[in-house]
Every structure is written in C-alpha cells, then in structure tokens.
Regions:
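Anion-recognition interface
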Residues: 1-342
Length: 342
C-alpha cells in the first residue's frame, strides 16, 4: 500500500507529520515505512512535493533512489506513507509519474476537510507570513464572489479530477467531526487508513505557531513598507524568518498593545451569518462527491456545523498605514531586520 497524506495547509498537517516522523521506528515495526527521501531533513516530504520533477522524471538520480526505496520496502513487506501539503496541488499526470517510479497500480490519498471559513482565515494569515500584503477583505472578495469555483473554498475543485483517476483512491477525513467528537486526527488516520490501531501520539508543540491577528497585521504593515505596496514579496518567506528570529517576548507584547490601542480605529470585523447558503451548497457537493470515501460515518450537518455567526478580525489597510505609531514601529522593525542582514 502506498499512501500520500496531501493536507491541505492548516489542517493539522504539522502535527501529523511530526507524529509520523517521531513514530517512524514504531511504524516500521508495524509494517509501514515513513521515508527520509524527499524530506530534506524535515518531518514532511516538502522537497518531493514542491520539486517533484527531480524525483519523478525518468533518468534522474532522485527517481532512481525513490524507486530503490520502493523496491526495498516491497522486499521487506512494508507499506509506505509520505506526507506534504504540496501534494494537494499535484495534477493527475504527476501522480501517474510518481506511481510509475514507485511501481504501483494504486495510490491512496488522504485529504482533510476543514471548515472553509476557518481554513480561509488561517490560510490568509499564513500568506502574510510568506510575504503577501493583501488584506483579508481583498482576499475574501477574490474567492467569495464564486465560492464553489474557488480551490480554496471548495475542495472538490481539485478532488473531482483526482476521483476520476483509476489509480487514485481517496480518503476524506472530516476535521470538524473529529474535533467535535474529541478524536485525535493522527490516531484516526492510523486506524482508518493505515490499519494501525493504538498508534502512540507524541505531544509535540508545533513549530509554525500561528500569529495573533495583531502580529499578522503588523507583519503585513512591515511587508507593505518593505515592498512599497507590492502585492507579494519574492523574498517574503525569508523576511518572515528574519522577523520571527528577531521577535523577542517584549516585542510581541509591545506590538500587540500598539495594534490594540493606536490601531483601534483601523480594527474591523467580517461577519458571516449562521448557516450561510454557500455552506449548505458546499456540504451537499462534498457529501455527493466524497460518497464512499469518508473515514468515519457522520450526519450531513456535522461536516461544517455553523449554528452561530462567525467573526473574523482584520485591520483596514488605509487606516493602519495612516497611523503614525504603527508606521514608525513597522519601519523601525524593518530597519532592524535590514541591519541584521548585513
């Protein structure tokens, strides 16, 4: 059996990958290989997912090494599991090429379904950390004009084409159902997909801890100043790493206080009414599209329950960048980052 856990982002992927990585010896004893190849020393196989041509094109050194891993696993009677969020962006042709390298007729894909509003908010925060400067309302407008056509808001945009592949078998994990029932997502995947009940969970603190909204918006202000208003910085990820390395505990406290006080006039809320029609349509689309693929039985209204209004905080870009205290602090932090780079 060959399994790819494909995310997507912000669906407990780091937690799952850390547990797979920490538990790889126990997995090996129970017939499952979590390979080092394609990981680049990280818990997840991000190099394989994002630089796939090096691994799945005929004649490359990495393709030969990957094929050797597959052959050795078969000789030992082992199954294989890989994990990376980037796999969710692969095309059917990429999965076909990967299957050829691994010499398998079937790949099992594990996809986690999370509430699309919460997922969107988390993903926007991650975008800011990667050098994007777009405001939350701007990103909402881009995707919510036609939510069922959005890859971000409707997983079936990607999964529909994958479900038609004869060599791909989908396993849909309902994130909100597991959370409501207090079921650990790692042990659930172990039991329902890998056939390994009672997997040991490592209580590992995630390294990519999410910023509070005040830190996210302050970083966006730094990005806007650094990029002179550009929508995205090519070195955004590197800048975020410098930002977090320099961020002391007292900096966090000062920035949070600054944004809550001086930035109060720029603070805004996006309100989503309870049980919006989009969510009902999406639920029906997913229930039909993933019929027979769910890893646990549940009622339709459990998939994305939304009995109450959702509220998402953000800061108005114009008002934020017209607040002298915020601009001064952001420029000061940017100057510190620039000096540290020299």
């Amino acid at each position: 059996m060959l399994v790819l856990h494909i995310g997507p982002h912000k669906t407990a992927t780091t937690y799952i990958q850390n547990n797979l990585f920490r538990g790889r010896r126990d997995l090996a004893r129970r017939g499952w290989l979590y390979p080092e190849i394609g990981a680049g020393g990280l818990p997840g196989h991000h190099d394989l997912a994002h630089n796939d041509a090096r691994y799945i094109e005929d004649g490359t050194e990495q393709a030969a090494a990957l094929n050797a891993v597959a052959k050795k696993a078969r000789e030992k009677g082992q199954n294989i599991i890989f994990s990376a969020e980037g796999f969710c962006r692969w095309s059917p042709a990429q999965f076909d090429a990967f299957a050829r390298v691994m010499e398998t007729d079937m790949i099992d894909l594990v996809h986690v379904m999370r509430d699309p509003f919460d997922l969107f908010y988390s993903h926007w925060g991650e975008e800011v950390k990667q050098g994007h400067s777009s405001s939350l309302p701007d990103r909402f407008a881009e995707h919510f004009n036609d939510p069922l056509a959005s890859r971000r808001l409707n997983p079936m945009v990607d999964l529909a084409r994958l479900s038609r592949q004869d060599n791909l078998r989908l396993h849909a994990v309902p994130y909100e159902v597991l959370r409501a029932r207090k079921i650990d997502i790692y042990t659930h995947i172990g039991t329902e997909v890998l056939g390994l009940p009672d997997l040991e969970v490592s209580n590992i603190k995630a390294k990519n801890v999410s910023f509070p909204i005040e830190m996210t918006e302050f970083l966006r202000a730094v990005t806007l100043l650094h990029g002179d208003g550009a929508r995205r910085l090519p070195d955004g990820s590197a800048m975020r790493l410098r930002f977090t390395r320099m961020l002391r505990h007292e900096d966090r406290k000062k920035i949070t206080t600054l944004m809550k006080t001086a930035g109060r006039p720029a603070r805004r809320k996006i309100r989503i009414p309870a049980n919006p029609s989009y969510m009902r349509r999406l639920t029906k689309t997913l229930m039909r599209g993933m019929e027979g693929c769910w890893t646990i039985p549940f009622e339709e209204d459990e998939l994305f329950p939304m009995p109450e209004e959702k509220t998402f905080i953000h800061y108005d870009t114009y008002l934020m960048m017209k607040t002298p205290e915020i601009v001064q602090a952001a420029q000061g932090f940017l100057d510190r980052m620039t000096v540290s780079e020299l």
